[in-house]
Amino acid sequence: CLVRLRRADLRQQLAVAGLRRYDPVRRTLRLHPELAPGQRGFQMAAQLALLEAAAPIATLVADPALPSDEARALARIGLASYFAGALLLPYGAFLGAAEALGYDIELLARRHGVSFETVCHRLSTLQRPGTPGVPFFFVRVDRAGNISKRQSATDFHFSRTGGTCPLWKVYEAFAQPDQVLTQLAQMPDGRRYLWIARCVTQHDGGWGRPGRRFAVALGCDLRHAGRLVYGRGLALDRADAA
């Protein structure tokens, strides 16, 4: 279907409706004027998912395992986001680039014209049978420790709010917004993980309107760290490294 795209100037309306607003009668998609190019692409792809893949998405969210309207709404958003990531960063080509670049998130973001956060989220979904990538878990938190996004390709689970160790490197990222930080961490069950974290800012734009800051992080079991540029120079074999 033909959809017209417009950069919206109705900021107050968009603040209520989110980063995009679709008018099905006029077939017009309005995007927040302060979105970066990569963010605009992602929002367009997510809306395309809701239009072109509406039937399969509806089938999936009708699963009885989703017990409430809220759960079904979140699943619908998650499926649209997965569609958008797959459209912008096709599985085979993106996995090949990730392996060739040692999963360097910043290089992957520049090569594909998307954000650091989009790359992190896509990396956490590369688990196709037969051709899997590194099994990452992805998380986005605010300064208070509230988790606003999470995705896991493993059995690692997060609490939704609070209770996170203050020594977790993810929180240090807020004090070093332009740096990618790494950390080896050992869990109470003895399992060890490599964490990669960076502070990202969502700009609302203009004087007196500071952007919202989040810390975005990827983690993986330490046995996969040798495949990543972030594992270079770390004492991965030392029992006390974490």
How would you name each of these model-derived features?
Residues 2-242:
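Conserved binding/catalytic microenvironments
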